[in-house]
């Protein structure tokens, strides 16, 4: 497999979208068109957009970028990487922006045709924000397995999504996950899981595996409307929920807790 390097570090989404600033896109376009035929894109970006101005619109702008790329190059799959942690940006007010970006990346793979995502939240960094060389090897393996499974229909390894959250009672919710994956939390402890309602944020204390899901209990009763977050902070807990094949559960932010026939993931 040949990879055409067009990456630029420390960039904003707007720099890759022809509908916005687009500077990096046009440089990429020149290089890509010189190569002739190609099969798809690898995308790992988002840290710079973890801010008040850009985070809330990331999903819509990413969707527009994908449409623009399809118009320019024809339809090609885009293999993406959900953001890893940042240990150098610990201002609590920034946590929500990291959650918004990670959730936009999760939603993109669920809602945009040809977009796929793998997790990186469990991997080591070199300086608190950049993935280590060992982490990049694992990311490459996950991307290759995703391509085999999603694009080529061959044995690989798929990512695990929180698809929806349902209320059971005022201290328990059911998370509906990608079918066919048994997800386990260490000692059934709900590290990095929170429910947010009109009274604020509450920690989740237990996550018990069931078929295609988790039963999560909260540290206090919650009120509806409420939303579920997982591994959403800039630097979430290091113990992450994983499936039986050691694939981490993708992070999510702001999933509405609602009855099954009303469930949405926003």
Region spans (language model):
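Cell-envelope and extracellular/periplasmic
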Residues: 1-266
């Amino acid at each position: 497999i040949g990879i055409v390097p067009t990456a630029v570090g420390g960039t904003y989404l707007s720099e890759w979208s022809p509908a916005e600033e687009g500077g990096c896109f046009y440089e990429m376009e020149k290089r890509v068109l010189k190569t002739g035929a190609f099969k798809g894109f690898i995308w790992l970006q988002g840290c710079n957009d973890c801010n008040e101005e850009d985070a809330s619109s990331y999903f819509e702008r990413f969707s527009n970028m994908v449409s623009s790329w399809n118009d320019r190059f024809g339809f090609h799959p885009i293999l993406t990487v959900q953001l890893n942690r940042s240990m150098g940006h610990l201002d609590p007010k920034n946590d929500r922006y990291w959650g918004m970006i990670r959730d936009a990346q999760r939603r993109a793979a669920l809602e945009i045709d040809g977009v796929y995502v793998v997790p990186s939240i469990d991997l080591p960094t070199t300086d608190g924000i950049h993935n280590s060389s060992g982490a990049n090897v694992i990311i490459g393996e996950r991307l290759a397995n995703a391509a085999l499974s999603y694009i080529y229909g061959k044995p690989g390894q798929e990512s695990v999504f929180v698809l929806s959250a349902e209320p059971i009672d005022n201290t328990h919710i059911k998370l509906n996950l990608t079918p066919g994956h048994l997800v386990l939390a260490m000692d059934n402890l709900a590290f990095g899981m929170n429910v947010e309602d009109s009274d604020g944020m509450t920690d989740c204390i237990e996550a018990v595996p069931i078929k295609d899901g988790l039963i999560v209990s909260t540290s206090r009763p919650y009120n509806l409307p409420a939303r579920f977050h997982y591994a959403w902070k800039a630097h979430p807990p290091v113990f992450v929920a994983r499936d039986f094949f050691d694939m981490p559960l993708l992070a999510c932010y702001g999933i509405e807790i609602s009855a099954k026939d009303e469930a949405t993931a926003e």
